[in-house]
């Protein structure tokens, strides 16, 4: 009777799975789906052409609740009767993700797990049951769990029967993305492998193998999408931060929420693995067999970063997992991999490799990123107002990790040398060479991590400075356009804008200094870009100051305060130059967000070439000439143009530092730096600050200074010429031609003169003349 009942149940479930909804969804080309990637606009499937499209409103991103996902499905598919959502079984690859307020979408590719938008009354999925496979199902009316929970139940059930999970679907919905049961197909191990190899890797019936231990994910369904998204974000975070001027603020909270479950899961799986590997001999045999397998990507085409234990190296190494299939030598983190395989495999390695060098239990340098608790946590988290504090913590963690690893290697080196005392000389050399290479690798890896850390930090600081400068300039222009304008408010906004530009200039110089120290070739390549950026800052400030001419009353009232403000900036630049000369640079990554400005040690010198670019060309004009500017009664302020003066045809009054400056006349501007002993290099700074000077009122003093300078220069030149002439003597150490017709006495005299002989009579008369 039981076999007959089983056949009846199977037929009933199959008939239910083959039912077709009656709401008109059968005529759609593709199933309604939505996909999210924090920091990017949401994507949805076009049911007419089967292609992924960006959010139609251009504003929705990264919805954190299932209710919000259901509402979003109803918004993007208003013509369909969306009643529920369920997480898809397979991750998908989607291109052309867009950012907010961006007209053009970049061709970045991300692998995410979408949500299916269920239309009409719920109908279970139709599951194909291959030969020798079994169709199973479980229902619990007292349980209402998520898709991920039931996926884990199905997989564990198949594992208990020594089979693989082939396909599965949800049963009996009890809420939004919550169900009371699951239907699934289990196939024998050999049959499942054959079916997967023969099937298309991108079809929906391929098995999603989540890797690692069978951890309980019942409470972490929302975090799974975020973790998969984080793995893909690591691949392009540097490029995103270098190209974009805006920060991904939407992803902060979601990533922070994902960190705690991730750490808890890691600790839990590590403790379970440690206990398992020390229980019985049979368990150790199983673990040894698992850790001896080669890494398998699997038939799917995803790019998920995972770790496997390399028996030949005696350590865990990274590889890319395709998303399905593969074997059990597949771990989420390096710590979990070493916890499972490290202790068990160490005994086997000692037995089989006694003639070789001892294996290193310390993680050897790899091209992959550091552990999540070191640099990755900083790199994966978008920048915010506490960027400098986060950077300092990441830098300290990086240095502490490097010191710990170096200390461990040194201790092992000492132990190896003690054990190698009785070994042949060749073996001793091999031990020394082995550890020398390891130390060099650790140093190189630390240098690469520092470089990556600093470059990411610099890019984030640059984006923040751009936002601050833009906001300060907008507030300054708004204050000038107010009716009536308030001089005090205008001055405060101008002061904030000047400080923002000063921060931008300081950051540019700091970045050039760091690049020059770590990569002189790259510094030579970006030299022209740095110069162009400094020129743009200079001209942008002059234009902003010139906007006061459009409001003469305000300009006249705050003239003294602005003069004092610009004079303070001049004094600050002098202090920067003095500190830079006296204090060597001993750390990396100092930036414009540091609280103390007295720690600044860097400036840049812009040197003229061939006399085509003089110091006077960089002197800004006095921004106040109210009498020479017509009154502006409408308080209209033109927007600031950041182009060079020659390109926009900027006109200035006589005496202006920008008068007659043309970009084609400036053939080249060199930024030269010299290394001085152990203190690194010093780059001197031509003062790119903006002073309010009244050139016309000091013409007499300037002429007097010029005349005095000419007189002093003349005296110095004459003194140098006389001193140089006095040094000339009749001593000659070169070859003197000797005439063959001279007498032997004259020839002998010539030889004596070549050897330094001087006629006392001649020397006496020379001294008398002098």
Curated annotation (Swiss-Prot):
What does the entry list under GO cellular component?
axon; cell surface; clathrin-coated pit; cytoplasm; early endosome; endoplasmic reticulum; extracellular region; Golgi apparatus
Q: Which residues carry this modification: Sulfotyrosine?
A: 217, 262, 336
Region annotation (GFLD subdomain) ranges = 28-123
Per UniProt, the short sequence motif YENPXY motif occupies residue numbers 757-762
Q: How does it sit in the membrane?
A: Single-pass type I membrane protein
What does the entry's domain section say? The transmembrane helix undergoes a conformation change and unravels partially when bound to PSEN1, facilitating cleavage by PSEN1.
Q: What is this protein called?
A: Amyloid-beta precursor protein
What is the originating organism of this protein? Sus scrofa
Q: What is the lineage of its organism?
A: Eukaryota, Metazoa, Chordata, Craniata, Vertebrata
């Amino acid at each position: 009777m039981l076999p007959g009942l089983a056949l009846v149940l199977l037929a009933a479930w199959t008939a239910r799975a083959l039912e077709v909804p009656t709401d008109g969804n059968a005529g759609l080309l593709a199933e309604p789906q939505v996909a999210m990637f924090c920091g990017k606009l949401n994507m949805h499937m076009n049911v007419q052409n089967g292609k992924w499209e960006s959010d139609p409103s251009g504003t929705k991103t990264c919805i954190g609740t299932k209710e919000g996902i259901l509402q979003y499905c109803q918004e993007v598919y208003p013509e369909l009767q969306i009643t529920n959502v369920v997480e898809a079984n397979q991750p998908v690859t989607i291109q052309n993700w867009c950012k907010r307020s961006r007209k053009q979408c970049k061709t970045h590719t991300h692998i995410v797990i979408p949500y299916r938008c269920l239309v009409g009354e719920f109908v279970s999925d139709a599951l194909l049951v291959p030969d020798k496979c079994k169709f199973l199902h479980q229902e619990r009316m007292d349980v209402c769990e998520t898709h991920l929970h039931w996926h884990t139940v199905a997989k564990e059930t198949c594992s208990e029967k020594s089979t693989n999970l082939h396909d599965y679907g949800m049963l009996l919905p009890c809420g939004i993305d919550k169900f009371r049961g699951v239907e699934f197909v289990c196939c024998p191990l050999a049959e499942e492998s054959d079916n997967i190899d023969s099937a298309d890797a991108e079809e929906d019936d391929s098995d999603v193998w989540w890797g690692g231990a069978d951890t309980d994910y019942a409470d972490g369904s929302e975090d799974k999408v975020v973790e998969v998204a984080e793995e893909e974000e690591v691949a392009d975070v540097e490029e995103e931060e270098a190209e974009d001027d805006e920060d991904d603020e939407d992803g902060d909270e979601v990533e922070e929420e994902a960190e705690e479950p991730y750490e808890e899961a890691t600790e839990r799986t590590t403790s379970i693995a440690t206990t398992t590997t020390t229980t019985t001999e049979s368990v150790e045999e199983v673990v040894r067999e698992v850790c001896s397998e080669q890494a398998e990507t699997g038939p799917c085409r995803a790019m998920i970063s995972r770790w496997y234990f390399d028996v030949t190296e005696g350590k865990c190494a990274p590889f890319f997992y395709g998303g399905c299939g593969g074997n059990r030598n597949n771990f989420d983190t390096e710590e979990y991999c070493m916890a499972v395989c490290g202790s068990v495999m160490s005994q086997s390695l000692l037995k089989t490799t006694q003639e070789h060098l001892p294996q290193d239990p310390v993680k050897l340098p790899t091209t992959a990123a550091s552990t999540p608790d070191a640099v990755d946590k900083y790199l994966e988290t978008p920048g915010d107002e506490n960027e400098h504090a986060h950077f300092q913590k990441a830098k300290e963690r990086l240095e502490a990790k490097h010191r710990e690893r170096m200390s461990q290697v040194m201790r092992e080196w000492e132990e190896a040398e003690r054990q190698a005392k009785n070994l042949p000389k060749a073996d001793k050399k091999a031990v020394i060479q082995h550890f020398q290479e390891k130390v060099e690798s650790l140093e190189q890896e630390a240098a690469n991590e520092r470089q990556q850390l600093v470059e990411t930090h610099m890019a984030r600081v640059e984006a923040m400075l751009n936002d601050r400068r833009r906001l300060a300039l907008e507030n300054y222009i708004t204050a000038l356009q107010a009716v009536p304008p308030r001089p005090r408010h205008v001055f405060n906004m101008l002061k904030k804008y000047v400080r923002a530009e000063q921060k931008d200039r300081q950051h540019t110089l700091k970045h050039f200094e760091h690049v020059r120290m770590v990569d002189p070739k790259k510094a030579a390549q970006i030299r022209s870009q740095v110069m162009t950026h400094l020129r743009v800052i200079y001209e942008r400030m002059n234009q902003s100051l010139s906007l006061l001419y459009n409001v003469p009353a305000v300009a006249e009232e705050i003239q003294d305060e602005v003069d004092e403000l610009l004079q303070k900036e001049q004094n600050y630049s002098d202090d920067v130059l003095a500190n830079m000369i006296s204090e060597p640079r001993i750390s990396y990554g100092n930036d414009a967000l540091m609280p103390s400005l007295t720690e600044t040690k860097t400036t840049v010198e812009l040197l003229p070439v061939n006399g085509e670019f003089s110091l006077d060309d960089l002197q800004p004009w006095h921004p106040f000439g109210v009498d020479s500017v017509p009154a502006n009664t409408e308080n209209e302020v033109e927007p600031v143009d950041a182009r060079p003066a020659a390109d926009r045809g900027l006109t200035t009054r006589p005496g202006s530092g920008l008068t007659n400056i043309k970009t084609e006349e400036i053939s080249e501007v060199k930024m030269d730096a010299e290394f001085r002993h152990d203190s690194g290099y010093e780059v001197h700074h031509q003062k790119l600050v903006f002073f309010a000077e009244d050139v016309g009122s000091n013409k007499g003093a300037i002429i007097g200074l010029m005349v005095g300078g000419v007189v002093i220069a003349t005296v110095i030149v004459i003194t140098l010429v006389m001193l140089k002439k006095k040094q000339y003597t009749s001593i000659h150490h070169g070859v003197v031609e000797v005439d063959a017709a001279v007498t032997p006495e004259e020839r002998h005299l010539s030889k004596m003169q070549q050897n330094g002989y001087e006629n006392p009579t001649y020397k006496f008369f020379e001294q008398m003349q002098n």
